[in-house]
Amino acid sequence: MAMPDAEVEVNGGVVVYEFVGPEDGEVVVLTPGGRFSKDYGGVHELAEALAAGGKRVLLWDRPNCGRSDVQLYGRSESHMRAETLGVMLEKLGIEKVVAAGGSGGARDMIVFTMMYPEKVTKLLTWCIVGGTFSTMSLAGVYVLPELRAVRAGGIEAVLSIPGAAGSWADLCEANPRNKERLLEVGAEEFERVMERWFDAYIPKANEAIPGVADWEFAQVQVPTLIVRGGAKDYDHPARTSREVLSLIEGARLIEPPWPEDAWEQRGLRRRSGEEVGFEFWVDGAPSFLAFIDEQSTGGAVA
């Protein structure tokens, strides 16, 4: 049911994507988290499950993920990716989508829905990052190592640092163009962008999720389903999912369709040396399909 990978140029960079599912199916953009590619564990499994329910799933390597070209612009990395997706859909001739994402992908899809409300029919999010601990943790994953490296040794130093959720070196290995693109950006501009993106990961009283002011959630006017964060999942707190629920009029919160400790168990397995991804996400497919297939007269979910 999967089609071969394809490429489209957006804002001077190549985006790698594929479709899974019937050509006449309702389009669902499925977006994972981290700097992980569309081929990361568990992503295709969920896509196939949604496709089995008649959906046409668009999987994409977001800029700075997988085999797509790196991009360094925008208010935050999520805003850059949201703009990329908006232009990409226009080039592909796709007018409306269900925006679905987990972890960092949830943030990307929330921002996309705010920036392109005319393109989104429904919003579906899970494993949402927020709160002081997880927001500051993201700074330590995505920008602080980069800032230290570029200030100490330029772009070449950035290419040598490891990444807990994917690294720039990984991106260059997956796509040789990326090393040249980073060198062309140069240390000064790279540092400037990292400083701007860093601001999103400074916890603020009026930001339930990193880099998005609470007042901006009023722009989300589509039926929205939120999966509650795990009780002990400090990276995707239950509190954050409830805060987002309170900010989107009419949104619905459901209990996790996977084990309560799925994220913690994933961490234990990774620390033991096992290669694991987002395999538990496929457990959400029945709930996700039921939500997507609900008839709506517009506006948010009652």
Identify the meaning behind each predicted range.
Residues G101-G105, M109:
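Gly/Ala-rich beta-loop-alpha elbow adjacent to hydrolase catalytic centers
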Residues G13-D69:
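Conserved HGGG/HGGXW glycine-rich cap/lid loop of the alpha/beta-hydrolase fold
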Residues M80-V97:
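Conserved acidic catalytic loop of the alpha/beta-hydrolase fold
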Residues V220, I226-R228:
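Short beta-strand/loop motif that positions the catalytic acidic residue
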Residues G250-A302:
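Catalytic active-site module of serine/aspartate enzymes centered on a nucleophile-bearing elbow/loop
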Residues N178-A213:
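Hydrophobic, aromatic-rich cap/lid helix
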Residues D233-T240:
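Conserved alpha/beta-hydrolase "acid-adjacent" motif
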Residues I110, M114-M115, T121-R151:
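Flexible "cap/lid" loop of the alpha/beta hydrolase fold
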